[in-house]
């Protein structure tokens, strides 16, 4: 056994040496064909370093809602009393309007922005919050505001992972060129991109990082745990008008949506991975949408590196490139954790508490960093497949998924202030029962 392990180690080290040489050759080729590449990598890295925030324990929360009328039909953007009018009604309390081409596309106030996703899913992005009681207040207030704005047509803002009635292809896109171009490009890959755009709704949690090392450590842990977060937050009982074929439909949607920009960030687990590697990843992704000289969207399937081969990117162009990748864990000026379905507010707050306790509790994060050591992108992909097939009964990373989730609840509680422990309870109860919100919905049908 020892001899076999030694041989395997030599083989792996030999392969790593070959990979390093191949990477160096590719980088040299890219530098030759993209003279501004190093300057653009530096511009992206500068932005990422500027995002570092020492001693912060804040969470940002984004929650998407699927708007339907009293019959379950989608409420479109442009219909009478549609989502455009919902935004107009919300403007009384969220007075900062985003208007493009005469279309109202978002409203905001300090600390809270209401925007719309491709098929008019209503999203509240709020925070960052130092404490969860403030998050609870903001989200409950928005829930009441949305209810009032939708009441003229008996509408509802559903917190589910996928439209429970309508097929994605039948849903209207909002008037935004970015989404037209994304729909065209992703449709050429398969049906999953349009399903993501039109049918899905999510919960996303963002966390701060202190420096580059802290950022990469948090990204790696979040990537390893992403399949388990998806399980704990699974809230898609219905998919494309029928009972779902298996658990974690959001995971499957993103698995096949576009391999160039989804799933794990390539190389995230490689020794030495850092901001420069993430910047190179951004430059090597097909843009789909680029910005012209007036800041307007245009269709472009070249990579960002090719588009900006001969000049430095502006800040707006850097921000845009960051928004055009959709991995499980995305980096901007914060770490964005993306695998969870949209959920009712008590579960959103529980999920935020889970993330806060795991990633800001010093001993909890240190425990997770040790536990995640040696896990690869392939291991994460296998974990997703196992959880889609077997849920809590699955084995992932050579352990029981259910037992890992138990430990995550314990570690999160350890990392939270005692005054916020109770926020974890809704999610902890689901984990203890080995069920998801989707399971509970299916069991009542």
Located regions from the model:
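Structured core elements
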Residues: 66, 204-206, 336-338
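Glycine-/small-residue-rich active-site loops that bind phosphorylated ligands and cofactors
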Residues: 131, 210, 343
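Loop-rich catalytic cores of soluble enzymes, especially ATP-dependent carboxylate-amine ligases
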Residues: 155-158, 162-330
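Structured mid-domain segments that build the active-site/substrate or prosthetic-cofactor binding neighborhood
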Residues: 288-378
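Terminal catalytic/cofactor-binding subdomain
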Residues: 5-191, 199, 234, 347, ...
């Amino acid at each position: 056994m020892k001899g076999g392990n030694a041989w395997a180690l030599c083989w792996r080290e030999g392969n790593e040496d070959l990979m390093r040489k191949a990477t160096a050759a590719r980088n040299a080729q890219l530098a030759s064909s993209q003279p501004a590449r190093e300057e653009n990598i530096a511009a992206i890295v500068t932005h990422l370093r500027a995002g570092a925030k020492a001693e912060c324990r804040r969470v940002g929360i984004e929650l998407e809602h699927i708007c339907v009328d009293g019959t379950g039909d989608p409420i479109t953007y442009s219909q009478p009393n549609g989502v455009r009018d919902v935004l107009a009604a919300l403007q009384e309390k969220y007075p900062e309007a985003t208007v493009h081409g005469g279309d109202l596309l978002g409203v905001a106030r300090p600390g809270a922005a209401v925007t719309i996703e491709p098929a008019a899913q209503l999203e509240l992005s709020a925070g960052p919050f130092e404490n969860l009681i403030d998050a609870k207040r903001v989200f409950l207030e928005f829930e009441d505001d949305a209810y009032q704005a939708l009441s003229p047509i008996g509408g509802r803002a559903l917190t589910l992972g996928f439209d429970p009635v309508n097929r994605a292809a039948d849903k209207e896109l909002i008037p935004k060129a970015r989404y037209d171009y994304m729909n065209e490009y992703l449709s050429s890959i398969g049906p999953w991109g349009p399903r993501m755009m039109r049918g899905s709704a999510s919960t996303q949690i963002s966390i701060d990082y202190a420096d580059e090392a802290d950022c990469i450590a948090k990204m790696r842990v979040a990537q390893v745990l992403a399949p388990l977060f998806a399980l704990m937050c699974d809230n898609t009982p219905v998919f494309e008008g029928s009972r779902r074929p298996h658990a974690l439909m959001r995971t499957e949607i993103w698995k096949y949506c576009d391999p160039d920009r989804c799933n794990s960030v390539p190389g995230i687990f490689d020794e030495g991975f850092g901001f420069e590697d993430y910047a190179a990843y951004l430059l090597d992704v097909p843009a789909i949408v680029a910005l012209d000289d007036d800041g307007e969207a245009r269709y472009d399937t070249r990579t960002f590196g090719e588009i900006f081969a001969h000049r430095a990117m502006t800040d707006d162009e850097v921000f845009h490139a960051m928004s055009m990748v959709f991995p499980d864990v995305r980096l901007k000026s914060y770490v964005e954790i993306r695998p969870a379905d949209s959920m009712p507010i008590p579960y959103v707050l529980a999920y935020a508490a889970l993330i806060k306790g795991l990633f800001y509790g010093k001993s909890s994060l240190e425990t997770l960093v040790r536990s995640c050591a040696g896990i690869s992108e392939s291991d994460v992909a296998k974990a997703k497949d196992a959880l889609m097939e077997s849920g809590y009964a699955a084995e992932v990373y050579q352990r029981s998924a259910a037992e890992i989730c138990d430990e995550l609840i314990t570690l999160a509680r350890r990392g939270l202030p005692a005054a916020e422990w109770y926020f974890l309870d809704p999610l902890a109860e689901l984990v203890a029962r080995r069920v998801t919100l989707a399971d509970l919905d299916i069991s009542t049908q």
